[in-house]
Amino acid sequence: MTLNLSVLTPNRIVWDSEVEEIVLSTNSGQIGILPNHAPIATAVDIGILRIRLNDQWLTMALMGGFARIGNNEITVLVNDAEKGSDINPQEAQQTLEIAEANVKKAEGRRQKIEANLALRRARTRVEASNPIS
């Protein structure tokens, strides 16, 4: 049995196919979704979406949004998403280092909040670019 997973951003469809299982980062922690999961709607946090397909795990960096699960259909609407295989690990690491430096030099509440969000996004991209063993 499979699940139909759709990952959508405002600009494009990132994923639209059947999967065996997913692990989704929500605002209240990670949840695993298998076929025949109870229907839910949840907020999606900045984090990794893990997808099991053909007994292999794939990753995707999600940048916050919402998910709806029901009748073996999963729709994930996010601000942005990138498949782990599409992320250049060196570029992601450089972005992380810049984000860490920006957090240290941020002044004022707004700058600190924006710098910390950029740091979370950068960490997520680095994590997604590393294959799951």
UniProtKB/Swiss-Prot annotation:
SUPFAM superfamilies: Epsilon subunit of F1F0-ATP synthase N-terminal domain. Its main location: plastid. It comes from the Eukaryota. GO terms for cellular component: chloroplast thylakoid membrane; proton-transporting ATP synthase complex. Keywords: ATP synthesis, CF(1), Chloroplast, Hydrogen ion transport, Ion transport, Membrane, Plastid, Thylakoid, Transport. One of its GO terms (molecular function) is proton-transporting ATP synthase activity, rotational mechanism. The keyword Plastid applies. It is a peripheral membrane protein. GO terms for biological process: proton motive force-driven ATP synthesis. InterPro entries: ATP_synth_F1_dsu/esu, ATP_synth_F1_dsu/esu_N, ATP_synth_F1_esu_C, ATPsynth_dsu/esu_N. It is found in: Plastid, Chloroplast thylakoid membrane. Belongs to the ATPase epsilon chain family. Produces ATP from ADP in the presence of a proton gradient across the membrane. F-type ATPases have 2 components, CF(1) - the catalytic core - and CF(0) - the membrane proton channel. CF(1) has five subunits: alpha(3), beta(3), gamma(1), delta(1), epsilon(1). CF(0) has three main subunits: a, b and c. This is ATP synthase epsilon chain, chloroplastic. It comes from Solanum tuberosum. The gene is atpE.
